[in-house]
Curated annotation (Swiss-Prot):
First-level EC class: transferase
Site-annotated residues for Plays an important role in substrate specificity: 228
Protein's name in the database: Serine hydroxymethyltransferase
Biological role: Catalyzes the reversible interconversion of serine and glycine with tetrahydrofolate (THF) serving as the one-carbon carrier. This reaction serves as the major source of one-carbon groups required for the biosynthesis of purines, thymidylate, methionine, and other important biomolecules. Also exhibits THF-independent aldolase activity toward beta-hydroxyamino acids, producing glycine and aldehydes, via a retro-aldol mechanism.
Source organism of this protein record: Acinetobacter baumannii (strain SDF)
Entry's Gene Ontology cellular component terms: cytosol
Length: 417
């Protein structure tokens, strides 16, 4: 039997590190676009006894006994995901977004096939063909980017590259793009060259679920997402598709046994909770506020003389170019971190600096909106960020902003004490 000992009793060193992270999350303002706060119910599911159960296979077709209850849980998650996103197929087993993407590649492509995806330097993701990723090492990756003048996807370039290279698959999606993607334009281009259209909507899945961003699921052949970020669920992945029996079979076998072994049943239960929450009116109102907050912040930066890539935002994030300020993203990240404001350095289109230094920062509003920030609070916050950057990291300015951050965090706690 296990002794009923708490972490703090058994491993005080680890307990202190966890407590410090708890404190950081409460006392710092989180603006990393891919981060959010899970509900207590999601965390309860992730910490449940479901973590003990091995369940290789799928509901009704397991390789282990004792799966009668986890079958119910996984089927609930599948059914809710399909209902939420209007999908005909859902696989809730991917451990993460990258694993979901990897399974799609495995299902639809052969090594060496040509893939057309957005360049990491222009707002794409590692798994969209970056040379350092499996997607760029295993496949012949061709990259498209943004229009230099508008900061928006250059669809003419996408079509030109597609006609030239005849990709087997086109990837639409992003990790740092602030405008609405024209999914149908991508579909039309893919159809011209006989390519699969694969959409990675990891960043905007919550917005899509709430109806405040276009839904790609019935346009693309396959769509993937993470379940955290704007969906506010566990750190995990999801694959969706419109009806196509051949593709569905390929996806099933690509996830298991092709790409993974046993699913994480505690995470799947947490996804089921997340999907149920995302069907609520409160969640829809939250997503609308996420976008309003991002737009309000972008307006403040523009008024302060900063360049926002593409001139604004239609979703939960935007890129702030610091080239005009002669400030690196790395420095801005560090200065703001000292003021208890968490962002991430990010390359901007045609960035003259390396990806380890960058000339910009990425700002997202999902987490601060979860805390309860509205336009008033985020406008103040944008002003504080501009103050810190304009001061070039002046210690007095940082200290002043840090005090303001502490006050507003105390007013808007993440979790009730």
């Amino acid at each position: 039997m296990f002794a009923n000992i708490s972490i703090s009793e058994f491993d005080p060193e680890l307990a202190q590190a966890i407590a410090s992270e708890d404190e950081r999350q409460e006392a710092h303002i989180e603006l990393i676009a891919s981060e959010n706060y899970c509900s207590p119910a999601v965390m309860e599911a992730q910490g449940s006894k479901l973590t003990n159960k091995y369940a290789e296979g799928y509901p009704g077709k397991r390789y282990y006994g004792g799966c009668e209850f986890v079958d119910v849980i996984e089927q609930m998650a599948i059914d809710r995901a399909k209902e939420l996103f209007g999908a005909d197929y859902a696989n809730v087993q991917p451990h993460a977004g990258s694993q979901a993407n990897s399974a799609v590649y495995l299902a639809l492509l052969n090594p060496g096939d040509t893939v057309l995806g957005m360049s990491l330097a222009h707002g794409g993701h590692l798994t969209h063909g970056a040379k350092v990723s499996f997607s760029g090492k295993t496949y012949n990756a061709v990259q498209y980017g943004l229009n230099a003048e508008t900061g928006e996807i250059d669809y003419e370039e996408v079509e030109r590259l597609a006609l030239e290279h005849k990709p087997r698959m086109i990837v639409a999606g992003f990790s740092a793009y602030s405008r609405v993607v024209d999914w149908q334009r991508f579909r039309d281009i893919a159809d011209k060259v006989g390519a699969y259209l694969f959409v990675d909507m990891a960043h905007v899945a919550g917005l899509v679920a709430a109806g405040v961003y276009p839904n790609p699921v019935q346009i693309a052949d396959v769509t993937t997402t993470t379940t955290h970020k704007t969906l506010r669920g566990p750190r995990s992945g999801l694959i969706l598709a419109k009806a196509n029996e051949e593709i569905e079979k390929k996806l099933q076998s690509a996830v298991f046994p092709g790409n993974q072994g046993g699913p994480l049943m505690h995470a799947i239960a947490a996804k089921a909770i997340c999907f149920k929450v995302a069907m609520s009116d409160d969640f829809k109102a939250y997503q609308k506020q996420v976008v309003k907050n991002a737009q309000a912040m972008a307006e403040v930066f523009i008024a302060r003389g900063y360049d926002v890539v593409s001139g604004g935002t239609d979703n939960h994030l935007f890129l702030l170019s610091l080239i005009k300020q002669d400030v690196t993203g790395k420095d801005a990240d560090a200065w703001l971190g000292a003021a208890h404001i968490t962002v991430n350095k990010n390359s901007v289109p045609n960035d003259p600096r390396s990806p380890f230094v960058t000339s910009g920062i990425r700002i997202g509003t999902p987490a601060v909106t979860t805390r309860g920030f509205g336009e008033t609070e985020v406008r103040e916050l944008a002003g504080w960020i501009a103050d810190v950057i304009d001061s070039k990291g002046d210690e007095k300015v940082i200290a002043d902003v840090k005090a303001k951050v502490e006050a507003v965090c105390a007013k808007f706690p993440v979790y009730a004490k």
